[in-house]
Amino acid sequence: MTWSDILAEEKQKPYFKQILDFLACESAKGKVIFPTKENIFNAFKYTELDNLKVVILGQDPYHNYNQAHGLAFSVQKGVDIPPSLQNIYKELARSIPEFKTPNHGYLVDWAKQGVFLLNTTLTVEAHKANSHKDIGWETFTDTVINKISENKHNVVFMLWGSHARKKKVLIDSSRHLILESTHPSPLSAHRGFLGCNHFVDCNKYLIEKKDQKIDWNLLC
């Protein structure tokens, strides 16, 4: 099974057509939607299903200009690193001594290694957080999470915050490793995310199960 198989199947369903119709109507009204159309499915472009090792769930895309490009928590180069990603870097630096904090938030090199950076809602209206949360995207991304669980073995799922942790029911914990904590947002990072050791625990598991690991330092 490939992403193309999953996408082809879902695109035939009424809910998916409703999503596309909604986006077309909003654009026709002059509303600005992030990420741009060609970047909406970048998580699937950069992380092939065959190569997928880790899933990190976000909620919805960044809603300011030049930020969102289809990968959860990632921003385009030349843009300030958002606070949640700053805390992700802090946890990496705390738990992995050799980690060098990048001067950007462009996470494509993680994605290419098999870190699937999936927002549960794939679009947002400019400057309106969660504005597209009820248009049907979660039906699609829930299906994606479930397909990963059913068709892969030994994937590490990182579920940060209450929204992501609700997706635990879609994952077979006998086949995969589920790591949970608070969200890396400044509002909650100090209540469990900082100190969670997820990146270390992830690599221990991948080495044990696959003799592979993620090079978290590989952010060119």
Curated annotation (Swiss-Prot):
**Active-site residue numbers:** D60
Subcellular location, in the record's words?
Answer: Cytoplasm
Cytoplasm in keyword set:
yes
The record's catalysed reaction(s) read:
Hydrolyzes single-stranded DNA or mismatched double-stranded DNA and polynucleotides, releasing free uracil
What Enzyme Commission number(s) does the record list for this chain?
A: 3.2.2.27
CDD domains per record: UDG-F1-like
Major localization listed first in the record, in broad terms: cytoplasm
What enzyme class is recorded for this protein?
Answer: hydrolase
GO cellular component terms listed in the entry, alphabetical order: cytoplasm
GO MF entry, a single one: uracil DNA N-glycosylase activity
Which family is annotated? Answer: Belongs to the uracil-DNA glycosylase (UDG) superfamily. UNG family.
Q: What does this protein do?
A: Excises uracil residues from the DNA which can arise as a result of misincorporation of dUMP residues by DNA polymerase or due to deamination of cytosine.
The protein's name is: Uracil-DNA glycosylase
Q: What is the lineage of its organism?
A: Bacteria, Pseudomonadati, Pseudomonadota, Gammaproteobacteria, Thiotrichales
Q: What gene is it encoded by?
A: ung
